[in-house]
Amino acid sequence: MSMEETAVLLSIHPEWCQKIFRGEKTMEIRKNFPKDFQGQPFKCFIYCTKGQNAGFRMEPDGSLLRLDGTVIGEFTRDRVYEIAPLNHAPDDLEAQACMDRDQIWKYTHGKGYAWHITELKTYETPLDLAAFHLRCENALRWCNNGGCAMHIERPANGNCCGN
């Protein structure tokens, strides 16, 4: 399976999205990762969740474009490190993740991974979730429409594979 065929949609809070796009955050802390993709790079679409700390962008006409609740960009996850219960991550993990050790432990509850962010791209125009499709193993079970893809209407709690 090529990287073009393999992708994950990640829900990320607006404050973390801002740090990623400013280049401050180069490691994304997750509670899990898709085991099917272990050892191979894959694309990650960034869904900026809706929240109080929403990001905005000034448009050429002077209007503000709200970025939360949309897919605002993508990156390639080229490496993953197990960070708990064993720590196989770089020594500067906290700095790369923009989190201290206590925050990481509280979030992962003792089991987690650090995803290395590379090849970051910001979309000029954010995408709605409806632009993405989830490939179904059993269309009747998942879609009930006889097709082989369904629109994503909300991000999954964890990872959501699609393309």
Regions found by a protein language model. Give the residues of each.
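Structured alpha/beta reader/binder surfaces that contact nucleic acids or chromatin modification marks
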Residues: 2-163
